[in-house]
């Protein structure tokens, strides 16, 4: 190569390098706006408890699409429905961030909510949809009505234990739907073991729970030298045994022809279509229970708080129940279409206090440009569900308040809130990752609300002087993913003289748990 040609070659390399570097820097300069972070840790120290409130406040300054650097990990926070829909409904944003301990080790990659976007997830999702879709969930209505009756009876008998009664109802309802198990107490060994699993999994998935999430090379450490790894592997073996035992008990009943409708039975009967092994089906059924029980009890708890804070909404729902159902019988799903305000109350409960106010995170698998902003591949994306559900542009200036009527039209029938999605809220998530059990959740909440408001009045508890006990409306308990209200007391009384007798009579017909 001559001196001249070498010079031209060197010049070409410099020009190409300049163009590439400029392009890369240009892309990163177009990152969405966000707060300045600290060296090394970036914005990590700014992401503390009640992140949804932090994101809402920062959104006032930085807008609907914000960028955070979390110790080198790009984090994109979304504060509007349009942006969330535009991004999270697309395949390239349907992955989940990798969680080495919670997903890879403790659940063997088979916990569907954490599973990466790929063929294994698609098979599990298809099987879950087959067992929980809108056209099949009506077979679970008798279970939901039965549990609602038991809850009404328990609240009338022991109102001071309402939290325990609500948690039992949620756990028993979902256990019956998933595994065809009869109503049980909250202390039932199966429920207790699965609840313990959910607690362990949630703690393992919390940011900062394990150093290996930030230093993946630690995964190569042999188990005998890494207690965190031994523990996770041990729990995977024990939890696999637990879920397989529950699943095989249903499989035995299916073989005998003695089973009732259940999600596990649907998996067994459709095994040839979706190609999952018994081990995979066992974990899928376990995941559906884990996701459903805690979120349902949290939603019921927020609704109880709303009834104390907004007595006019309670009275309007009761008036509708009196008109449609009367006082001689209990409400049923046959009344569903004729109770638009009660159904609106379901939607409003899930909008007003989403049990997961920041949603499960998504992950981008490719670079993307949105509205001129660069979103790098591998970014974690979070939708600020709390703020989106309270956006005044969609829900009005009173979006902070509980008002089921916002979901009704001028004739009192259910209507689509302008600018929102099908559910009139985004608490079930987005796109391919939308909650597959949302129809069960809606129906369970409908049964509970209709039954309780037919039978009882819910009021604030009083002190010895007759004054209402104070409530911490803004406080909450963060159980990992699920958020529930701080403990509070309620006053529960029969709504009319015959109500308690009718509930007790129905409970006797249903049997005890």
From Swiss-Prot:
Subcellular locations according to the entry: Membrane
Q: Respond yes or no to whether keyword Glycoprotein is given for this record.
A: yes
Q: In which pathway does it act?
A: Secondary metabolite biosynthesis
Q: What does this protein do?
A: Cytochrome P450 monooxygenase, part of the gene cluster that mediates the biosynthesis of melleolides, a range of antifungal and phytotoxic polyketide derivatives composed of an orsellinic acid (OA) moiety esterified to various sesquiterpene alcohols. The first step in melleolides biosynthesis is performed by the delta(6)-protoilludene synthase PRO1 which catalyzes the cyclization of farnesyl diphosphate to protoilludene. The orsellinic acid synthase armB produces OA by condensing acetyl-CoA with 3 malonyl-CoA units in a three-round chain elongation reaction folowed by a C2-C7 ring closure.
Q: What else is known?
A: Armillaria species are both devastating forest pathogens and some of the largest and oldest terrestrial organisms on Earth. They forage for hosts and achieve immense colony sizes via rhizomorphs, root-like multicellular structures of clonal dispersal. One genetic Armillaria gallica individual localized in Michigan's Upper Peninsula stands out as exceptionally large, covering hundreds of tree root systems over approximately 75 hectares of the forest floor. Based on observed growth rates of the fungus, the minimum age of this large individual can be estimated as 2500 years.
Q: Which CDD domains match?
A: CYP64-like
Name the chain's protein: Cytochrome P450 monooxygenase ARMGADRAFT_1018418
Q: Keywords, A to Z?
A: Glycoprotein, Heme, Iron, Membrane, Metal-binding, Monooxygenase, Oxidoreductase, Transmembrane, Transmembrane helix
Whether Protein transport counts among this entry's keywords is no
Use of this protein: Melleolide sesquiterpene aryl esters are cytotoxic secondary products with anti-cancer potential. Armillaridin shows therapeutic and radiosensitizing effects on human esophageal cancer cells. Armillaridin induces autophagy-associated cell death in human chronic myelogenous leukemia as well as of hepatocellular carcinoma cells. Armillaridin can also inhibit the differentiation and activation of human macrophages and thus might have potential to be developed as a biological response modifier for inflammatory diseases.
Q: Which InterPro entries match?
A: Cyt_P450, Cyt_P450_CS, Cyt_P450_E_grp-I, Cyt_P450_sf, Cytochrome_P450_fung
Species classification = Eukaryota, Fungi, Dikarya, Basidiomycota, Agaricomycotina
Give the enzyme class: oxidoreductase
Q: Which residues are glycosylated?
A: 442
The Gene Ontology CC terms held by the record are: membrane
List the membrane topology term(s): Single-pass membrane protein
Residues spanning the membrane: 1-21
The entry marks the following residues as binding heme, namely 435
Q: Which cofactor does it need?
A: heme
Q: Give the EC number(s) under which this enzyme is classified.
A: 1.-.-.-
């Amino acid at each position: 190569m001559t001196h001249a040609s070498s010079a031209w070659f060197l010049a070409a390399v410099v020009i190409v390098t300049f163009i590439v570097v400029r392009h890369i820097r240009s892309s990163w300069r177009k990152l969405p706006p966000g707060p300045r972070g600290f060296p090394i840790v970036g914005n990590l120290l700014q992401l503390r408890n009640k992140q949804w409130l932090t994101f809402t406040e920062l959104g006032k300054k930085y807008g609907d699409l914000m960028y955070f650097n979390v110790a080198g990990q790009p984090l994109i926070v979304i504060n509007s429905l349009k942006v969330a829909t535009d991004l999270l409904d697309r395949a390239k944003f349907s992955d989940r961030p990798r969680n080495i301990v919670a997903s890879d080790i403790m659940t063997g990659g088979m916990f569907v909510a954490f599973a990466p976007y790929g063929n294994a997830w698609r098979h599990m999702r298809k099987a879950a949809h087959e067992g929980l879709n809108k056209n099949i969930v009506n077979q679970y209505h008798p279970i939901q009505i039965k549990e609602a009756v038991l809850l009404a009876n328990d609240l009338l008998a022991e109102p001071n234990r309402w939290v325990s009664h609500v948690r039992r109802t949620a756990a028993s309802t979902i256990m019956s739907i998933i595994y065809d198990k009869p109503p049980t107490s909250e202390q039932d060994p199966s429920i207790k073991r699965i609840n313990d699993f959910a607690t362990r999994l949630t703690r393992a998935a919390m940011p900062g729970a394990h150093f290996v999430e930030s230093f993946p090379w630690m995964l190569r450490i042999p188990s005998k030298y890494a207690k965190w790894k031994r523990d996770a592997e041990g729990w995977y073996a024990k939890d696999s045994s637990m879920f397989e035992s529950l699943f095989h008990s249903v499989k035995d009943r299916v073989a005998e022809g003695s089973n009732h409708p259940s999600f596990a039975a649907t998996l067994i009967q459709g095994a040839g279509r979706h190609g999952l092994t018994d081990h995979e089906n066992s974990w899928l059924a376990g995941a559906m229970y884990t996701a459903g029980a805690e979120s349902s009890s949290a939603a019921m708890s927020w609704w109880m708080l709303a009834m104390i804070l907004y007595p006019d909404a309670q009275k309007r729902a009761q008036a509708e129940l009196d008109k449609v159902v009367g006082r001689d019988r209990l409400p049923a799903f046959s009344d569903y279409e004729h109770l638009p305000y009660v159904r609106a109350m379901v939607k409003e409960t899930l909008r007003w206090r989403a049990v997961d106010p920041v949603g499960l995170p998504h992950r981008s698998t490719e670079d993307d440009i949105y509205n001129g902003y660069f979103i790098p591949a591998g970014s974690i994306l979070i939708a600020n569900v709390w703020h989106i559900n309270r956006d005044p542009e969609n829900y009005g200036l009173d979006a902070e308040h509980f008002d089921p009527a916002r979901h009704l039209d001028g004739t009192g029938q259910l209507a689509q809130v302008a600018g929102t999605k099908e559910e009139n809220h985004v608490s079930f998530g987005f796109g391919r990752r939308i909650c597959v059990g949302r129809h069960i959740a809606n129906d369970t909440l409908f049964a509970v609300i209709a039954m309780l408001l037919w039978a009882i009045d819910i009021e604030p508890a009083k002190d010895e002087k007759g004054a209402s006990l104070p409530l911490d409306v803004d406080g909450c308990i963060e159980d990992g993913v699920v958020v529930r209200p701080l403990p509070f007391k309620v006053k529960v009384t029969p709504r009319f003289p015959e109500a308690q007798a009718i509930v007790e009579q129905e409970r006797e017909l249903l049997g005890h748990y």
